[in-house]
């Protein structure tokens, strides 16, 4: 019975999520070359903040596994495509990215 209630709750939540215009899958932003990388640190975590030449805003991640590949992409001038929930407004955090040839 509890399993059925959980599945029903999940179905209602999913319906509300999509009816409000939210997307579960992460979208991709316009690819661009990293113009600069900067870091901000507080007591809890370090944010890596990047600026792409194809976007007006900065984007950030707190995923430490992305530090080295982002630095590589910046050093060699690879195009980066960010995978994020919002490319143009709101929270500019990204969870992953892909590299493109120049």
UniProtKB/Swiss-Prot annotation:
Protein name per the record: Putative protein p7
Species assigned in the record: Acyrthosiphon pisum secondary endosymbiont phage 1
Taxonomic lineage: Viruses, Duplodnaviria, Heunggongvirae, Uroviricota, Caudoviricetes
